[in-house]
Design a protein with these regions (language model features):
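Selected alpha-helical membrane-embedding segments in polytopic membrane proteins
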Residues: 645, 649-759
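Active-site-adjacent substrate/metal-binding segments within catalytic domains
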Residues: 66-68, 73-82, 90-95, 100-104, ...
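Extended acidic/polar, glycine-enriched regions
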Residues: 133-135, 224, 228-313
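Extracellular glycoside hydrolase catalytic/binding regions
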Residues: 445-553, 584-585
């Protein structure tokens, strides 16, 4: 009895778990109808339980849609049923609402083909000969591209996490043998928006001759022999937002089509006194396209139609919607929820987000990096939210922007976007790049060529997002409609500096509307008051100050980064949040939609209400005690040894003033104290630890330094360890000191190998002495290293001290080579050649590897030229 009870309990828990997983994805039938409305088609969501495998051998059950963070390759399979009538009378397609990676599709163990997802919706035609009545096995292999442009386009700062899987619903669609395969529309207005001219292009596709013959037989109620063409009429039915059908608007078009062909039919009509779509009144007409033969509707499909016009105003400073100025109040939005479900977001949650955006007073969202979810677009059409869609070109060096692979990738992406989204009224603009090198000629050429490519295919506006500090506009930007400027996103913001930059931008970039993108990271659960730059109050204050700055000028709008927190590909150290190092905490709400103080602030600002009071707090930054304590202890210990140990004092004097004699003694086997050498090495290592830790502590809130660290340290676990060290100065000093001591031993081993090359009887003990005592001059900056964290307070002081330290380390390297020549008793030129050549060769190999794998040289130069 107890066994049965536990079994029932287990089954119940599994069902609850599956139901909870299901709640994060999977469109209900009525939601699916809002995306693909037809009474003549079989439309079935394939969301539900699938089999999934990491290797194609070991399978387990899981839900679809779903995606797994950082997975490289996944195998999916499930079956679906077709009756004999369904198989014979319909043509079957798979509709994927969004897959980011490459996929391979097989039906009944027969390979169909490979497709590239890109997260935009796409159809896969299932060949008739591969289908059978009864159960059909659908197999999908999803894999991430690992080479080329895909690898580099994920490198940018705050790049969202990558997922592998099927994050949005797959849909099985059965169409008649003659079906509507595409619909495009453009619109224009006249007589002060009292008349709308609609130009449409309807695509009609046909199946095989056998299926067309069967369709003709059904429609005529007579058996038909083999024929060449099929005749039908195409009709368009327009429904007013109030539900009434507009009569005598569109005339039917007669077509004749051959088997396995696609026709494009242009159909134009006018709507008098249209009800316009706007953010305040999102009025939606519907267009139902029908294929009719012998008074029988063969196929029909319904599309939304929002009549609106968004263009640049006559003053070239504002955007006008339907003839009226529109100030953009937007937020960047990331389709992600929680830490487990990731980019698989339930339709109900998407709708709740859109409703919250309206309550905030927002009228636009900016989507970064991924093609929008069709259901999200449907909701924005319904509720009146404008969408700015960014292509996946972010913070990219000019050498990558100019590559042919990148150009082809972007052209393919925008064509898929236009096919999927061009007819939606909420989609108003395409972003063709963010954070590019404005001074590079390749950026101008890319903008000119790609803008022309898009303008030929789309009626949407075009823009680029430009980093603060960029040069004057390139002449090749003429086809852009407006600019978005992105603030620094630094934790330690300087609002006065950004005020000056906004004014400079206004003068330098005249002639186009300007929108400003700004935001600030916050430390989770930090409520210390805005005196702490990582606090929730500091985020709210920054957003308030920047908002009022933009509202005080004649600008086209603003976009806040961001509505919600989102997971990122690489850990960051700028927020000192070990529990959230891989989350961009820039949101007004966190990943679970819990609101922050900045949510209340933006709601008040967007709705022109009284903004909430902010608490300053008593936070003040102080120098970490670890620098002073460890620095002073090491300094006094070193001075104590010099004053009390005569032999040690003599070694120090001779190593500094008479290095040749000092190392000649080593060559002649005059033994130095090993214990004193080890202690000296500890002091020197501690000095290096103090210096490097001071630099890291100074740069702990700098995004550019964090980005370079992400390039240098490509392993997330190691990067997280280093990030934690940066904020814990004592552990950082000790860790770097230990690493330095280990390097002393490693270099000593290397010198021992060089000695073997020269056939010299030099022991490891001797090479260790060479390394340690050659670095002796470092100890004389030990007192400076103890207080260096207080001296390095600006980029200018950092550059001066860095230059001096580089010169010092070059001198130390020279001392090591000179000492090696003396101890090895060989010509100095040979040692210099081998030592210098080894360093150059090692650096060259490392740089070649990093450049090939991560584009390090290109990205390093990019950071240098775009930093503000």
């Amino acid at each position: 009895m107890q066994y049965i009870f536990h079994l029932v309990l287990f089954i119940f828990c599994v069902q609850i778990s599956l139901a909870q997983e299901k709640s994060f994805g999977g469109l209900q039938d009525w939601q699916l109808q809002s995306l693909h409305s037809s009474s003549t088609r079989s439309i079935s969501s394939l969301a539900g339980i699938w089999e999934i495998s990491y290797d194609g051998k070991n399978w387990y059950k899981s839900t679809v849609p779903s995606a797994i963070k950082d997975a490289k390759k996944l195998y999916y399979r499930r079956t679906f049923d077709l009756t004999e009538e369904e198989r014979q009378n319909n043509s079957w397609q798979l509709l994927f609402l969004g897959i980011e990676e490459e996929i391979e599709v097989s039906i009944n163990q027969i390979y169909v083909r490979q497709y590239i997802g890109g997260m935009s919706p796409f159809y896969i035609q299932l060949p008739d000969k591969m289908l059978k009545s009864g159960k059909n096995l659908l197999e999908i292999v999803v894999s991430k591209p690992s080479q080329g442009f895909y690898k580099f386009k994920q490198q940018y700062e705050f790049s969202p996490s990558t997922y592998c899987g099927i994050p949005r619903d797959p849909v099985l669609i059965g169409t008649p043998s003659l079906w509507i395969s595409g619909f495009k529309s453009t619109q224009s207005f006249s007589n002060n928006y009292t008349n709308a001219a609609i130009n449409t292009n309807v695509s009609i596709s046909s199946a095989t001759l056998e299926k067309l013959g069967r369709l003709r037989s059904d429609s005529t109620k007579k058996t038909s022999a083999v024929f060449d063409k099929m005749s039908a009429s195409v009709q368009i039915e327009v429904k007013h937002p109030d539900g009434q059908i507009l009569t005598n608007v569109v005339s039917p078009q007669t077509i004749e089509i051959l088997p396995e062909r696609t026709l494009s039919i242009p159909i134009s009509f006018q709507i008098p006194n249209p009800q316009l779509w706007s953010v305040e009144s999102p009025n939606l007409y519907t267009i139902t396209v029908k294929i009719i033969q012998n008074s029988i509707t063969i196929d029909e499909l319904t599309y939304p139609l929002g009549l609106r016009e968004l263009k640049v105003g006559p003053d070239k400073k504002q955007l006008f919607m339907n003839g009226k100025p529109l100030f953009i109040k937007g937020l960047t939005y990331f389709e992600e929820y929680g830490l487990k479900t990731g980019i698989t977001v339930s339709p109900n949650l998407l709708e709740q987000d859109v409703k919250n955006l309206k309550l905030l007073g927002a009228n636009a969202i900016k989507l970064q990096g991924k093609a929008p979810n069709p259901y999200l677009i449907h909701l924005c059409d319904k509720y009146g939210i404008l969408i700015f869609v960014d292509l996946d070109v972010f913070d990219m060096p000019s050498s990558i922007v100019s590559s042919s692979e990148m150009q082809i990738e972007m052209q393919n992406s925008i064509e898929r976007y236009i096919t999927a989204y061009e007819r939606n009224p909420s989609i108003v603009a395409w972003g063709i790049g963010e954070g590019l090198e404005e001074s590079a000629s390749s950026t101008g050429k890319y903008t000119k060529d790609f803008s022309a490519f898009v303008k030929q295919r789309s009626s949407k506006l075009l823009y680029r997002t430009i980093r603060f500090g960029a040069n004057a506009p390139n002449s090749d930007n003429s086809q852009l409609d407006f600019y978005i400027f992105r603030s620094t996103r630094q934790v330690s913001d300087n609002i006065d500096r950004e005020i000056k930059e906004v004014k400079r931008i206004e003068k330098s970039f005249e002639g186009k509307p300007l929108i400003f993108l700004f935001g600030k990271l916050v430390q989770t659960n930090n409520k210390n008051g805005y005196s702490d730059p990582l606090s929730a109050e500091a985020q709210a204050k920054y957003l308030r100050d920047f908002y009022k700055l933009i509202k005080s000028g004649t600008y086209a709008g603003l976009v806040v980064w961001s509505y919600n927190d989102y997971s990122i590909r690489r850990p960051i150290f700028t927020t000192n949040s070990p529990d959230a190092s891989k989350i961009a905490t820039s949101g007004l709400v966190d990943v679970f939609r819990n609101t922050r103080l900045s949510y209340t602030m933006i709601q008040a600002l967007f709705n022109e209400e009284r903004d909430p009071l902010l608490r300053a707090g008593t936070y003040s930054e102080s120098m970490p005690i670890g620098f002073v304590v460890l620095g002073l202890v090491a300094t006094f210990a070193f001075l104590f040894m010099i004053s009390r140990l005569r032999r040690f004092r003599e070694y120090v004097v001779r190593a500094l003033l008479r290095p040749y004699n000092f190392y000649a003694d080593i060559r002649d086997q005059r033994i130095l104290s090993l214990s004193q050498t080890v202690v000296l090495g500890i002091f020197i290592s501690l000095t290096v630890g103090l210096i490097l830790s001071a630099f890291l502590y100074f740069a702990r809130t700098n995004n550019d330094v964090d980005f370079l660290f992400s390039l240098i340290i490509p392993w997330n676990e190691v990067k997280e360890f280093v990030d934690n060290l940066i904020w814990n100065s004592t552990i950082s000093i000790i860790s770097i000191s230990i690493i330095t001591m280990v390097l002393f031993y490693a270099f000593a081993v290397f010198l021992r190998l060089i000695a073997i090359l020269f056939a010299k009887r030099v022991l490891f003990y001797d090479t260790f002495i060479i390394i340690v005592w050659s670095c002796l001059p470092l100890l004389f900056i030990l007192p400076l290293a103890a207080v260096l964290v207080k001296i390095v307070t600006s980029t200018f002081s950092l550059m001066i001290i860095t230059t001096l330290l580089v010169a010092l380390f070059v001198w130390l390297f020279y001392r090591i080579l000179r000492a090696s020549a003396v101890v090895f008793d060989v010509d100095s030129f040979k040692i210099y050649a081998i030592g210098g050549g080894s360093i150059v060769l090692s650096l060259a190999v490392i740089m070649m590897y990093y450049s090939y794998e991560y584009g390090f040289v290109s990205f390093f130069y990019y950071v240098q030229t775009t930093s503000f």
